[in-house]
């Protein structure tokens, strides 16, 4: 039986195939691709995601309309039950096509536009997709967490941050090689987690409870190393 990681990536691959030529023009973001960043042998499984987040280089209504017309030719249609104009559906799969910069319809994640230039290719289920560097992925998640303002113990964005810190072997090195702006943001994130009055709890509640104390200390060490960059 496929696990969460395999199921998430299988759905991402199905979306990539449906996009066809447009697949070369987008970057996959969000929790559906998080297992790509899990380089730790024996990494825990990520959570299942309800939708696929795809970043697109559009910023005007006319560009969004042109994208809508292109997607319709690929049997990808606006979700009639969607809560925002960026949500589409394809054979029961929910897909959010997120603009890479702010539009007249509202803000977007400020790390998507710089992330587009730094995206790299990887292959899943036999098809190539573009994803963000792990440092920028963390920056998008930190901004998303702050914009929603939820308790870190119950936040999917914060859960994803902890998952990457726990399961990516090269995260500190990647942050060290990132831009000064990314480093500044991730240092703020690190300070928040380490200085939180319930620091251990907000980390350990998102990781395997059998090894929570050991892995939690390992994550805190990574955060300290990020602060020293």
Q: What function would you assign to each model-found segment?
A:
Residues 1-229:
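Compositionally biased terminal segments of proteins
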